[in-house]
Amino acid sequence: SVASCLFALCMQSCFQDMDHPAFDYPESTGEVPTTPLKMYLPFDEEDIRDKGEWGFLVADNGNAKFAEDGIAGMAYQGAENAYILAKTPSILENNMPTIGDLTVAFWMRTTKNTSAQGLFSIPNSIKFWGNFDIFLENNNSETQAFFKVHIFNQTAKENDERWVEAKIDDIFGSEWVHLAFVYDGNTSTITVYRNGEG
């Protein structure tokens, strides 16, 4: 299983489990906050609530587990059938360029994966793939991770969809690694940083 501070933002309307009715989310105001930290999940005391400025409504799907030896306190421990779901504000659903620059950063400690894992997604309610998706693919390496990032609705009209691949050394093992996926809204490019180095 993956022991990490990973989370996934998924659109709840993609599925409906009749044993677990749909979440009762309030409507988004449609206004983009001006503060830089939109979402923050520190997982203190096994708390999955968002401490960022947007106050995403976060729910546990699959009985979330936590590890006590996180980089600073508790860490979310993902599993095949357990993930965190945060309701995406309507402002983010179908128009990626309006948010400008975006950084998704987290600490991760995991062993080598044997199948693809979804790490993060800003969904798109019109298309199959989301506006911004991060996947950890199987790379057949004991230490090097293979990330695939999907970007949709970029600024270049002739190329509305793009996949970016990044192979990053020294990810798997017993040490915590800080990863940052930085999206530049002006150029529609992604840069991946490992422990601050690109």
Each language-model region and where it sits:
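Extracytoplasmic low-complexity segments
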Residues: 14-81
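Glycan-recognition/cleft segments
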Residues: 120-153
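Solvent-exposed strand-to-loop "edge" motifs in beta-rich extracellular domains
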Residues: 43-46, 107-113, 122-123, 137, ...
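C-terminal motif of bacterial Sec signal peptides marking the signal peptidase cleavage site
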Residues: 9-13
